[in-house]
């Protein structure tokens, strides 16, 4: 992995799981746009969610979008104020995630929109650990600094995520020291 050089041009990233059948998706889009982040990554994005987001400030304020809607919980979308130079849906341990390369003022940046399986059963826990390992394997091969953002269905108290967030990979929530840091469970 590479570390972005210190510049006066930070890149702010916000992530949200839209919760699949959220009746307030357009409102959520407005609230996320109001955060003023440079990049917004969303999980559980369907065609219906995208249609709702088209009526929000997120759609108008973020001219660059990569979308990979899917039925149920596997869809994703990445919204950016920076040009997208490449985007593709990738399979990590059999689960789709959205990889997007951006042209930022500080240089190229790769954003991986993550949504791992919730480790609720033994089978799911194995798949979840495999997905986290696949993410760890993906980062060193990246041609540019990489942000892993999304719903990891974990906390840093879970050993596989703690292992991913060690070494050269840093947890932005811990570095920033403020904001919402939980990715599971966080239903309110």
Where in the sequence are the language-model features?
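N-terminal membrane-anchoring alpha-helices
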Residues: 1-7
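Soluble catalytic domains of enzymes that build or remodel membrane lipids, polysaccharides, and related
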Residues: 9, 13, 19-34, 39-188
């Amino acid at each position: 992995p590479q570390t972005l050089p210190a510049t006066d041009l930070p890149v702010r990233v916000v992530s949200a799981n839209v919760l699949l059948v959220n009746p307030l998706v357009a409102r959520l889009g407005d609230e996320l746009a109001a955060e003023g982040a440079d990049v917004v990554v969303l999980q559980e994005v369907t065609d219906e969610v995208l249609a709702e987001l088209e009526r929000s400030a997120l759609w108008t304020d973020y001219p660059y979008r990569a979308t990979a809607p899917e039925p149920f919980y596997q869809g994703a979308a990445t919204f950016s104020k920076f040009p997208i130079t490449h985007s593709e849906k990738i399979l990590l341990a059999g689960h789709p995630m959205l990889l997007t390369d951006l042209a930022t003022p500080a240089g190229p940046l790769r954003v991986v929109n993550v949504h791992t399986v919730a480790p609720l059963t033994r089978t799911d826990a194995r798949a979840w650990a495999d997905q986290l390992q696949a993410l760890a394997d993906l980062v060193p091969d990246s041609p540019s600094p990489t942000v892993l953002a999304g719903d990891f269905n974990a906390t840093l108290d879970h050993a596989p995520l703690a292992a991913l967030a060690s070494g050269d990979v840093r947890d932005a929530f811990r570095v920033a020291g403020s904001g919402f840091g939980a990715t599971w469970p966080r239903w309110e």
